[in-house]
Amino acid sequence: MVADEVKYPAGFGFKDVVSHGISGLVVLDKSSQTVIKTPLFDDCEVALSRERHIYERLTQRGGHERILRYHGTVESGIRLEYAPNGDIRRTLCAQEKEPSMKTTPKQHQQWALQIAEALAFIHSAGVVHGDLTCHNIFLDENFNAKVADFAGSSLDGTDLLVCVAASHEYPGPTLSVKGDIFAFGSVIYEITTGAAPYKELSDDEIEARYKRGEFADTASLGQMGVVIQKCWRGQYDGFEAIIQDLKAQGENPIMPAT
């Protein structure tokens, strides 16, 4: 990101940036403890417009506590709830460096359930996320998961504007509920193991293995591993069944599957 080429919201600059992606720049508005997401460059406005329409749809449907709250538009961007603990991937990276920050199986189960509940609501509103990774799931002040980043998502069957990482990509139609379910399986795998599936392999090799139905081993992950495999193998038709399976795990999601 070249600072002097970026479009900042009025009154904000490089010092206020908390995150950026391929299409959007996120700055912190300290006065309201919200963030403003704007197009990174002029040619990114289509993606941000898509995201705005999706947030408006989700808000019209009542919103959901596991999705970043939408606070309307700002210039060509949108104002969203601020998640002070960053994204889940940042937390996973931090625990590698500092063992005292290691997350627990109970925390993993909570995140999995919160993300699944968010996705069930998202799909009910005619939205396919299409880019579900730990980078797009944020943590609020109480470390509750919040799904976000709809700039590449589909609304009412429109084309996806982004491709998800190979480790999370469904070996079938990606513009589908099953595409998000497959990615969810990879998200939970990363949360429970600390690394994306097949992290050591090239994108081409990952794609080839997925097409052959060869997925990362989850035997050591107990009941959570069973859910992950069912996501990858297309054994769920929607998130409602996933939510039921996650709730049935009780307090011991890593206990051996029966």
List each language-model region with its residue ranges:
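Conserved N-lobe motifs of Hanks-type protein kinase catalytic domains
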Residues: 61-65
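Regulatory extensions flanking the kinase catalytic core
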Residues: 240-258
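ATP-binding glycine-rich loop module of kinase domains
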Residues: 5-60
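C-lobe/activation-segment region of protein kinase-like
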Residues: 144-146, 151-241, 245
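Conserved structural core of kinase catalytic domains
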Residues: 66-105
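Catalytic-loop of the protein kinase fold
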Residues: 119-140
